[in-house]
C-alpha cells in the first residue's frame, strides 16, 4: 500500500456499526469509501451506501460478493461474525488486501487463521477500537502489577440486548491484560459464571459478570477489591461512532505496513508507555 488515499470496503454496511463506519469514512481525511457489502438476499443490495448511512449520495453501490469487488478497495473493515469474517479473510489474503477486524467471539482456530493470514497481509485485530478502552487496558496492566496478587479481581460488562456473544471481546481483552501482567494465562484463572452453592471465592481467579439490556452501547468495569478498599477502572461508551473513528484511523496507520498482526495499542503507540 502507498501513502495515497486509502480506499475502504465495509462489510455489513447496512447494520448499526456498518452505517456508523460509512459516516466515519466521510468525516475523515485520507480515506474514501471504495466498496460496501451486504449479505446475499439482503434488500439493501443495489442501494447507494451513502444514502443508506444518511450521508448523501456516494456513488458506491452496495454489493453482495466481496470477491468481485477486490479491485475497489485497499483495506476491508469487518465488524460482522466470526464465520463471515474468516470467509472475508481468505479472500483478502488471496488478493493481498489489508484488514481491520473488530469482530469478536472467535475460537482458537479462528484466531490462529488470523495470525497465519498476517504473514501475507496487514491486519489490525482488536476487541475494541475506542481510544479510551485501549488506554484502560494499559491502566489495567499497571494496576495488576501493583495490586493483582492480593486483591479479588472482577470484570463487569453491559451491552445492548442484541449482542450475541458473552463475555464481550473487550471484557476478555481486559482479563487477558490483567492475567498477562501477572504472568498467568486467562484460561487458567477465569470464572465465567456462578450459580447455586459455589463455596468461597478462590484466590487468584478473575471473575466475569455480564448484563444484556436495552440499548447499552458498552460499559466495562474492572474491580480490584481488598478488605477496606477497592479500585474500579471503568469505561462507558455512549456512541458507536467512537469505535468507528478508531477503526478508520487504523486503516490509515495500516497503510504503512504490508503485513503483520497488530492491535489498537500498536496504532496508538501505547506499547511504548
Swiss-Prot record:
It is found in: Cytoplasm. Pathway: Amino-acid biosynthesis; L-lysine biosynthesis via DAP pathway; (S)-tetrahydrodipicolinate from L-aspartate: step 4/4. It catalyses: (S)-2,3,4,5-tetrahydrodipicolinate + NAD(+) + H2O = (2S,4S)-4-hydroxy-2,3,4,5-tetrahydrodipicolinate + NADH + H(+); (S)-2,3,4,5-tetrahydrodipicolinate + NADP(+) + H2O = (2S,4S)-4-hydroxy-2,3,4,5-tetrahydrodipicolinate + NADPH + H(+). NADP(+) binds at residue 39. NAD(+) binds at residues 12-17, 38, 102-104, 126-129. InterPro entries: DapB_C, DapB_N, DapB_N_CS, DHDPR_bac, NAD(P)-bd_dom_sf. This is 4-hydroxy-tetrahydrodipicolinate reductase. It comes from Yersinia pseudotuberculosis serotype O:1b (strain IP 31758). The lineage of its organism: Bacteria, Pseudomonadati, Pseudomonadota, Gammaproteobacteria, Enterobacterales.
Amino acid at each position: 500500500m502507498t501513502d495515497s488515499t486509502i480506499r475502504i470496503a465495509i462489510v455489513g454496511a447496512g447494520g448499526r456499526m456498518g452505517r456508523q463506519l460509512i459516516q466515519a469514512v466521510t468525516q475523515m481525511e485520507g480515506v474514501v469509501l471504495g466498496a460496501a457489502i451486504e449479505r446475499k438476499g439482503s434488500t439493501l443490495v443495489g442501494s447507494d451506501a451513502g444514502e443508506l448511512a444518511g450521508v448523501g449520495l456516494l456513488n458506491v453501490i452496495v454489493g453482495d460478493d466481496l470477491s468481485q469487488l477486490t479491485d475497489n478497495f485497499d483495506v476491508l473493515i469487518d465488524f460482522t461474525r466470526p464465520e463471515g469474517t474468516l470467509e472475508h479473510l481468505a479472500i483478502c489474503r488471496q488478493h493481498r488486501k489489508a484488514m481491520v477486524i473488530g469482530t469478536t467471539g472467535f475460537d482458537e482456530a479462528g484466531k490462529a487463521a488470523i495470525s497465519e493470514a498476517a504473514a501475507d497481509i496487514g491486519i489490525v485485530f482488536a476487541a475494541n477500537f475506542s481510544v479510551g478502552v485501549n488506554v484502560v487496558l494499559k491502566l489495567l496492566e499497571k494496576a495488576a502489577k501493583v495490586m493483582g496478587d492480593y486483591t479479588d479481581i472482577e470484570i463487569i460488562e453491559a451491552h445492548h440486548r442484541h449482542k450475541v456473544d458473552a463475555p464481550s471481546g473487550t471484557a476478555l481483552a481486559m482479563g487477558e491484560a490483567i492475567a498477562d501482567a501477572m504472568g498467568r494465562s486467562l484460561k487458567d484463572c477465569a470464572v465465567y459464571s456462578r450459580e447455586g452453592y459455589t463455596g468461597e471465592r478462590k484466590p487468584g481467579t478473575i471473575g466475569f459478570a455480564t448484563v444484556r439490556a436495552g440499548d447499552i452501547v458498552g460499559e466495562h468495569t474492572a474491580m480490584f477489591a481488598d478488605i477496606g478498599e477497592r479500585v474500579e477502572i471503568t469505561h462507558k461508551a455512549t456512541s458507536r461512532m467512537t469505535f468507528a473513528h478508531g477503526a478508520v484511523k487504523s486503516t490509515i496507520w495500516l497503510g504503512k505496513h504490508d503485513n503483520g498482526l497488530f492491535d489498537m495499542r500498536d496504532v496508538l503507540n501505547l506499547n511504548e508507555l
